[in-house]
């Protein structure tokens, strides 16, 4: 998310505390917050999907559900036709 939008979120939050928001400003704040949260979720999801969990012996112990997502996206050399 662009810094100008984050600044606007903060500006609206400050205004809400001091003098209140108009109806249009409330809608704008809600829209900007949703956009921010969606971007945050995408970032976290992308980070988690990139994880590979390895035990002390070097064995891949990544959960099956995560491996399947990685197979679909071709992450960590996993290919859709791989079964392990």
UniProtKB/Swiss-Prot annotation:
Task: Tell me where on the tree of life, at the top rank, the source sits.
Answer: Bacteria
- Where does the record place the region Disordered? 57-84
Query: Main subcellular localization, coarse class?
Result: cytoplasm
Places the protein is found: Cytoplasm
Keywords, A to Z, come to: Cytoplasm
| Entry GO CC | cytoplasm
**What InterPro entries does the record tag this protein with?**
DUF896 (IPR009242)
Q: Which family does it belong to?
A: Belongs to the UPF0291 family.
Q: What is this protein called?
A: UPF0291 protein SMU_447
């Amino acid at each position: 998310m662009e810094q100008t939008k984050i600044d606007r979120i903060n500006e609206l939050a400050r205004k809400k505390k001091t003098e209140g928001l108009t109806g249009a400003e409330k809608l704008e704040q809600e829209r900007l917050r949703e956009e921010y949260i969606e971007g945050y979720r995408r970032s976290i999801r992308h980070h988690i999907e990139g994880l590979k969990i390895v035990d002390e012996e070097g064995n891949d112990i990544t959960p099956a559900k995560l491996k399947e997502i990685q197979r679909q996206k071709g992450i960590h050399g996993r290919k859709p036709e791989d079964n392990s």
